[in-house]
């Protein structure tokens, strides 16, 4: 058990971070890495790194974000590698561009791993306290963060403040029709006074909600009635610094709801907090409660329920798929209607939690607020949902909070073409959100480039140049790049004719022209393993280098075209839009987009991109239209 810190030696910090969740931990560590004297304030030190909802990290798009956080020397990847008990790569039947690393975690092991990292971090102190307010000074005529006030009355001076409050900002828990309980998580008090302070400083707060399912007793489940779901035979670590997964691996299991389950839920919808107008705020669209599933999809006879162990030594199981705010007795009845759970014991009931968030359009791409200099938001306060989304915002907010202390440092901003984190932040600050925002591969225009395997190649050097990445990690990247370059050179120097290939049972276009080994990788049926069979000397390279170059070679022609598209897109960001443009003539533009553009009359592509509701696809259509218009004008002249 960690000692509680009641006092701190100094009363002034460069950066103060409020919240010890996934966003707060990454923000505090990032600020400390850049060199700022940083203080992390959390209401309970023992809850640092707590997985409030599902015991898992990663998934489709989300897993790429974890890799990106790790590439920037973040914490999440290292922590999950010490706690993973069921690891898998989702979408393995599809291309690497949509692979999604995911790991079930031992809750206690993850929390311990994160606390071990945070409590021993250089330049970072941790204080157990509650922040109730913050003050500002005027800097060049604009308000700027000056201090934070604790519930005990103590004032801490700081030049930069990161709020990563999660579901605690004005948090309220609901179960059934009972009166809501003020809490950010079951058993933990909310940050009510801080929410009022934000309002006093001119921020308009909205409300969102999320939910969690009951926890059930492992020993009361009839596992023979469920389907086993094994993890990957060789677990893949999240961190580029991890050699292997250390904990034993276990299976997850699948069962399904049925018509009886749905009847029980349907008969009690009027008693569920989420459906009884007690919590009339937006819920996560892509992680709905069982009440929402039954109501929105009446044609479905069943829904999957994933039974996920919460730890190697824990008797608690997380039934993923039945998040609920029904009364407790209804929750148990509903669970016992599911195959394999007929005699299940409930260890903890499910609930809905509603909380405050701020319209993320009030932020710059650095996640600094437009209203107050030095004030940054990260995580669910920006309208997102998910551990991974929170961590990605945390690392950007913390880094920029520290970098902004010096005029010699440029802001750390990730573009949509550079990272899923960049896609997410750009979506948030330009489009805003009216419901909990979640990342998907479909949100990224350049997902062929934004893969989980190359996050370090994309971001580590960028982070190193910003002072965010350690010499050790940069050295690992440098060595990896050197080996990959040697391998690519070897593949370009090695060639073979189609005729010789055919003798080996490999058939390509019989035009007589020699093909280099690297060019062969672009053939649909040729993999790096086949090249190794042809040229065994390639085995002298590491499996990591062979895998990375294999993917790059497979996608090489497409990546080259995409790189040209990205460069063209960036150049056209400042391209002017003629005042006489008719948006009704732009092919592929929705009526809604046409109306918004007509009203706003943006003068450039960049200005059009920042109109709420105008998607990247719409921008691409406008660019194509302007190109065609330009060519037609040139031909006519």
Curated annotation (Swiss-Prot):
<feature type="binding site">
    <location>
        <position position="191"/>
    </location>
    <ligand>
        <name>FAD</name>
    </ligand>
</feature>
<protein>
    <recommendedName>
        <fullName>tRNA uridine 5-carboxymethylaminomethyl modification enzyme MnmG</fullName>
    </recommendedName>
</protein>
<dbReference type="GO" id="GO:0050660">
    <property type="term" value="F:flavin adenine dinucleotide binding"/>
</dbReference>
<dbReference type="InterPro" id="IPR040131">
    <property type="entry name" value="MnmG_N"/>
</dbReference>
<dbReference type="GO" id="GO:0005829">
    <property type="term" value="C:cytosol"/>
</dbReference>
<comment type="function">
    <text>NAD-binding protein involved in the addition of a carboxymethylaminomethyl (cmnm) group at the wobble position (U34) of certain tRNAs, forming tRNA-cmnm(5)s(2)U34.</text>
</comment>
<dbReference type="InterPro" id="IPR020595">
    <property type="entry name" value="MnmG-rel_CS"/>
</dbReference>
<comment type="subunit">
    <text>Homodimer. Heterotetramer of two MnmE and two MnmG subunits.</text>
</comment>
<dbReference type="InterPro" id="IPR002218">
    <property type="entry name" value="MnmG-rel"/>
</dbReference>
<keyword id="KW-0963">Cytoplasm</keyword>
<keyword id="KW-0285">Flavoprotein</keyword>
<dbReference type="Pfam" id="PF01134">
    <property type="entry name" value="GIDA"/>
</dbReference>
<dbReference type="InterPro" id="IPR049312">
    <property type="entry name" value="GIDA_C_N"/>
</dbReference>
<dbReference type="Pfam" id="PF13932">
    <property type="entry name" value="SAM_GIDA_C"/>
</dbReference>
<keyword id="KW-0520">NAD</keyword>
<dbReference type="InterPro" id="IPR047001">
    <property type="entry name" value="MnmG_C_subdom"/>
</dbReference>
<feature type="binding site">
    <location>
        <position position="131"/>
    </location>
    <ligand>
        <name>FAD</name>
    </ligand>
</feature>
<comment type="similarity">
    <text>Belongs to the MnmG family.</text>
</comment>
<keyword id="KW-0819">tRNA processing</keyword>
<feature type="binding site">
    <location>
        <begin position="19"/>
        <end position="24"/>
    </location>
    <ligand>
        <name>FAD</name>
    </ligand>
</feature>
<feature type="binding site">
    <location>
        <begin position="283"/>
        <end position="297"/>
    </location>
    <ligand>
        <name>NAD(+)</name>
    </ligand>
</feature>
<dbReference type="GO" id="GO:0002098">
    <property type="term" value="P:tRNA wobble uridine modification"/>
</dbReference>
<dbReference type="GO" id="GO:0030488">
    <property type="term" value="P:tRNA methylation"/>
</dbReference>
<feature type="binding site">
    <location>
        <position position="380"/>
    </location>
    <ligand>
        <name>FAD</name>
    </ligand>
</feature>
<keyword id="KW-0274">FAD</keyword>
<dbReference type="InterPro" id="IPR004416">
    <property type="entry name" value="MnmG"/>
</dbReference>
<dbReference type="InterPro" id="IPR044920">
    <property type="entry name" value="MnmG_C_subdom_sf"/>
</dbReference>
<dbReference type="InterPro" id="IPR036188">
    <property type="entry name" value="FAD/NAD-bd_sf"/>
</dbReference>
<dbReference type="Pfam" id="PF21680">
    <property type="entry name" value="GIDA_C_1st"/>
</dbReference>
<dbReference type="InterPro" id="IPR026904">
    <property type="entry name" value="MnmG_C"/>
</dbReference>
